[in-house]
A protein has these predicted regions:
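N-terminal secretory signal peptides that target proteins for export/translocation
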Residues: 1-2
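Periplasmic c-type cytochrome electron-transfer domains
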Residues: 5, 18-157
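Bacterial N-terminal signal peptides
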Residues: 8-16
Length: 157
């Protein structure tokens, strides 16, 4: 019986040792690529073409990620606000007709949140027009101390 355990230990040790690899042995692929799925945008009749930046093309995966981030409260300083808090889908992605939007910790803003429908065709965003692209606009509310109050360094994974 003792010989059986010794043989079993030798077999197990041999299997373990032959399956061990040195880090950097060449089997891993650090240049793994991801090929996102292009999203075909169907533009309604009468609408002009939408300007889509070359460095940020529409993809199925990008739209899915955007939807998740839009509804995720983790992008606020106390995990209580998402973009959808002030841009409610139930109210045409607006702030339910409120005169001023309420941000983190109940702080009232200076304006209400504009509706975010068909924004791909708008020449500028925010009420004062300071953002010229959707990508530029997305950087504003998260670190804003009245709106979501989360530093980008704290949002990084």
């Amino acid at each position: 019986m003792k010989q059986y355990y010794i043989v079993a230990l030798i077999v197990i040790a041999t299997l373990l040792l032959t399956n061990c690899k040195k880090a950097g042995s060449g089997d891993e692929n650090p240049q793994e690529t991801f090929d996102p799925t292009p999203l075909e945008l169907i533009i309604p009749q009468g609408f002009p073409d939408m300007v889509i930046p070359d460095d940020n093309p529409l993809t199925v995966e990008g739209v899915a990620l955007g939807r998740l981030l839009f509804y995720d409260e983790i992008l606020s300083g106390n995990d209580s606000q998402s973009c959808a808090t002030c841009h409610s889908q139930s109210f045409a992605f607006s702030d339910n007709g409120k005169q001023t939007s309420e941000g983190i910790d109940g702080i009232k803003g200076d304006r209400n949140a504009p509706a975010v429908i068909n924004i791909g065709w708008l020449p500028s965003l925010f009420w004062d027009g300071r953002a010229k692209t959707i990508e530029e606009q997305a950087l504003g509310p998260v670190p804003n101390p009245i709106e979501m109050h989360l530093e980008w360094t704290d949002a990084e994974i």
